[in-house]
Amino acid sequence: MTDAKGPPPPETRGPATVGAWLALPRGGYYVRTSAGPIQIGIPPETIKDVMELKLDVPIAYVLPRDLFDRRRGLSVAEFEFPAYYSFFLLKRRCRLVVLAPDVERRVRAIFQESLFGPTGEPLATEFADGYPEARRPRFQRESEYFRTVPGRGRIEADDLVEFIQVKGGSAEIVPGITIVDQGDALVIRDNGKDIAVVGATVSLPSRTSSTDPDVSPASWVAPSFGVTVLGASHGFDPSGKTTGFLLWMGGRAILVDPPTDTTDYLRARGIAPKTIDGVILTHCHADHDAGTFQKLLEESQISLYTTPHILGSFLRKYSALSGLSEDLLRRTFSFHPVRIGAPVHVRGGELWFKYTLHSIPTIGFDAFYGNRSISISGDTLYDPKRVTEMFEQGILDPARFEDLIGFPGHHSAILHEAGIPPLHTPVAALAELPDDVKKRLYLVHIAAKDVPTDNGLRAAREGIEHTIRVEPSAAPRFADAIELLDIFAMVDFLRDLPLSRARSLLQVARRMTLPAGEHIVTQGTKGDSFYIIVNGTVQVVKDGIPIKRYRAGDYFGEMAILLDSPRNADVVAKSDVDLVALDRNDFLASLRGSEMLTRLERLVAVRNEGAWELLAQNTVLAHLTSAQKTQLQTYLVPCQGGPNEVLWRAGDIPKKAYLVDDAVVTLRCPEGELKPFTSGAFVGEVDALRSTGPSPSSARVTQTGKLFSIDRPDLVRFFEDNPGVYLSFLGTRFVE
């Protein structure tokens, strides 16, 4: 049901698609015409589908009604790489068909940020006090250099893209080929004959995984310091993923330019989202920021590390793409601004950032942990010959030139890009480096097949099994305490512990490592400990039947402690697991009299009322992670809905939302009275609750029964902690 401000069904793909079309693996429709193929919908890396399937490159791309798939958190209008491919390789413009004039405006805004970069220079506050002005980049001069193509001059958006607007319901794409906009469907007409009908809204296919999502490799343990390469290639390599990393510091990770669907890739290999608490955004090209935006909308709110200059560009770009305001997008993450020339402190280590030499503002960085260091170049042009030419032409100031002509060869490990010139580092320049540097050098942003085998260079290898470990011989100060505090912060009701209570937990926490198959908790025994999972997966088994699994960041054992009752289920290590245990008396003493204990007691009560099973009946809430479901349950309050009881009135500021159990609730809204809502339905004026504005609808109980209420402040906090869930509920008054 999609009217009256309900969300779209998770798998909606528009009307039945018929005719001469092909559904592309990453999403979108490929329609063959007599003049050449046309593609409707452009998901990230779509050009790789065409290359892998050995299809002709489309002569035109149609942007769908919605440019952004909220369910997947991805663009369906990623025209950057099709435009680059057409311009640089095929030597032609990329035709973009837009269904409304406003869409062209939005696309041009995106192009400004991704192709040419933000206007103006960074503020002085983005650099450390005393950082020499002569070392600061002059982005306007550098950008002009990169956007000037020999033989063509200065590149403009219209040199890459030809816009075709649908007016009066139709548009001619090329002579003889017409697109007709029928509202919820698009018709492709070839010389007067309808050859395909496709949905005007393109929903991306569901994520797939070939690996058991709950089992981690038993032999793999996260390094205290190191890098996992998630992707080592570029946007035109059909066999490789775009370049991105996991930077491990203190046994936890920060993502760097994650490829799309990174969370699922890691979960399938036993690395839970709560193991990752930050993302570094190096710049705003689609092969680096598409997965970043997707990650910001998943599970809990995380930290975003970049400069304010790059952040502003990122927000403008994705506001234009998603149709969401910059202010709303800004609330989906915790921004940690980085300053050039000053360290960012992370779990006892340091990150030092620098602006690289690229077509748009881009950062690279050096990471230090204990007595070891790792350098990650970011996209950059390291080519002494070209850099010298830029200096001689007056594009680079002397101090900036000196920074760019040097190579960071002194680090323990160096991950350096070797992409496609002229924007990237030529392999030949890296081949000139000393042999002892090459031994610590890993090439990224390059297809493995393009790395020469005779000059001592090597491509970085993707996957957690190839993690580059740079273990320090001396850990940073307070490393153990920092790690324990990070573990407590993974638990929602412990995240905001006062310092005095956190100190108490530090004193009594116990670390445990158990092999796969070990019983951690036995059904029927007395509950004497509370457990937090640090690494690995556990299986909850009740009366011999597996009922749920928990991963890193999840916890268990609280019910038996609070109720002082026997354990009601077994908990078995599904993989090797690393746990933190808190004894019953220590746990209760640390939380006694706090809001955290109140929330935990509420969770136990709600679980006994069957709330977990109720969430599984809701199309959106069923897809929450176990950690999200647990957090939501700490805010739910069971209540009884009386006959014709009014839950909220039109014109009033609503105070609660509700999850319906065996009651029946009816909504009356400006569109009329809606069908009754029953078990598993979420009802609540989300926008009014978020803004404390008046409700346009009213709700009442039409059949007596049980409900779960959630107070407005608790709902707001849940949405703030889980921005992707908030986007699923944005603009709704019910979710079934």
Language-model features, listed with the residues they occupy:
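Active-site metal-binding loops of divalent metal-dependent hydrolases
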Residues: 230-234, 258-261, 284, 356-358, ...
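Non-catalytic propeptide/linker segments at domain boundaries
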Residues: 145-146, 153-237, 241-244, 249-254
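Short beta-strand scaffold segments in enzyme catalytic cores
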Residues: 28-32, 186, 243-247, 361-367
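Di-metal (Zn2+ and/or Mg2+/Mn2+) metal-binding site signature of metallo-dependent hydrolases
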Residues: 272-299
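Catalytic core of the metallo-beta-lactamase
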Residues: 338-394
